[in-house]
A protein has these predicted regions:
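Conserved structural position within tetratricopeptide repeats
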Residues: 39-40, 70-74, 104-108, 159
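"A position-specific structural signal for the A-helix of alpha-solenoid helical repeats
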Residues: 17, 51, 85, 129-136, ...
């Protein structure tokens, strides 16, 4: 184990292989157990907490997902992946105003800044974070009942999609959200 609860470079390959295998086999409960163990061993690494949040979301354990995401954010609030995942967890619990504060933080910075920040992983990764944050902004507006703003965000997300740029959201999901904006029942009728 690295000093002070940090992961050492030579340990990452073994851990990455284990994570990839468990994800590929959709062994979400085993993956959760593995990540809990890693988060205790490497208690200063926000990565494991962020991954735990994602797994808990998959398992529909939204309160737990939020707790892991919050802890990751407390450890490393400058990491844009941590911020993005925290937004996701907050929106899942309808903590809309808290989520919007972080959405605005990501919107304010350039893609280049995100790409080459301390925890940045390059331009494609940063474009993915920025565009998927636009989708989450749409979710925020949809939950607030601001349908025109929500539709605009989802449409921009769709327009900004590019081959080779990963998204957490399928095109089908985005189109469904746009349709939801168009056919959302009016609060007065």
């Amino acid at each position: 184990m690295g000093s002070n609860g940090f992961l050492l470079q030579e340990e990452t390959k073994r851990i990455d292989e284990r994570l990839s295998l468990l994800k590929a086999e959709s062994q979400w409960n085993n993956l959760k157990l593995f990540l809990v163990k890693m988060s205790k061993k490497y208690y200063n690494e926000s990565f494991f907490l962020t991954e735990l949040s994602n797994v808990c979301t998959k398992l529909e354990q939204l309160e737990e997902a939020y707790e892991y995401s919050r802890k990751a954010f407390e450890l490393n609030s400058a990491d844009y992946l941590v911020k993005y995942n925290y937004i996701f967890a907050l929106l899942n619990l309808d903590r809309l105003d808290e989520a919007f504060v972080i959405i605005k933080q990501i919107k304010r910075v350039s893609t280049i800044h995100i790409a080459y920040s301390k925890s940045g992983e390059g331009l494609k990764w940063a474009k993915s974070i920025k565009n998927d944050t636009k989708y989450l902004e749409g979710v925020y507006y949809l939950k607030k009942g601001l349908l025109a703003k929500a539709q605009k965000c989802f449409t921009l997300h769709l327009r900004n999609r590019r081959r080779g740029i990963y998204s957490d959201f399928t095109k089908r999901q985005v189109l469904k959200k746009i349709n939801e904006c168009l056919h959302h029942p009016k609060p007065w009728g």
